């Protein structure tokens, strides 16, 4: 009798994706983040579902409903903080996952990479809309500032903003639709993740050397299932430490004040995981220019396969490119810090230099370093 694992129409899909999947024998812990992202997504959908059972998307009661969840619902505070800090873990894993792809040349699988970039945009949109839902001061003003950026689009801008708002300001209609989309998008993301994996399994995984590993593959289970479980335990530990010891560390104190359209907070800033993009937006004095730079700071990932000039795929054996890669990481950390600072000297000029450096490294310095490495190796 054939094994049900290999014969049942549904089970054999799971088998070929997570059990008998041939995987390179040398992939490091940097390859753990894909599975961690899947766990994060499931955690966010589950905690979000239970939060939605108690949340009301009305401007009069939204803030109080979140307070009610924390005070009166059994373990509601655990749900709320797991969801809020789960988003932070999600973005940590996302940025490390993208960074791994950049370092090891995984972007050469263009279909997988492009779906990944679209997924990144979708997750960012979901997180932004979720931040608006508690209807605190930073929720309201964050929504006002970010949606208002669309008014920079020539001719249709103002109409577009009012269409998104559902009125002449961020109000009840805006909150209701943001809740609807925030609930819907994670399920669309789940479907896109399936497509992401479908494209990945067409080619198989990359590995740290960047050299094809078809002649040296091992089954995913038990080797990488046990490795993924270790990664999961470490991530869950970090998340629980955050949730149970300092749940508000990554949040903004202003969001514990109910939204007040008549009182602007002194420093409007998004959650920490958007600060690098916010710093790039603020570093350009022109509104439309800032919006373009903001979008391009993420969209630039799409053209990275076109900027690959090296004869080698991975950066493992390319010291010049490695230096530039870590300079880019340091630059992004600098931008993240600047995004949280007020708009005054010297932060403005530091932000502008860091923004120019960000685009320069990706578009100019990295391709040139790759060509130099080819030349040094007489290729």
Swiss-Prot record:
Binding annotation for heme b b566: 97, 196
CDD domains noted in UniProt: cytochrome_b_C (cd00290), Cytochrome_b_N (cd00284)
Pfam entry (one): Cytochrome_B
A Gene Ontology molecular function term of the record: metal ion binding
Topology of this chain in the membrane: Multi-pass membrane protein
Cofactor binding mode and count: Binds 2 heme b groups non-covalently.
Family label: Belongs to the cytochrome b family.
Miscellaneous remark of the record: Heme 1 (or BL or b562) is low-potential and absorbs at about 562 nm, and heme 2 (or BH or b566) is high-potential and absorbs at about 566 nm.
Known function: Component of the ubiquinol-cytochrome c reductase complex (complex III or cytochrome b-c1 complex) that is part of the mitochondrial respiratory chain. The b-c1 complex mediates electron transfer from ubiquinol to cytochrome c. Contributes to the generation of a proton gradient across the mitochondrial membrane that is then used for ATP synthesis.
Official protein name in the record: Cytochrome b
Naturally occurring in which organism (per UniProt): Myotis mystacinus
Lineage: Eukaryota, Metazoa, Chordata, Craniata, Vertebrata
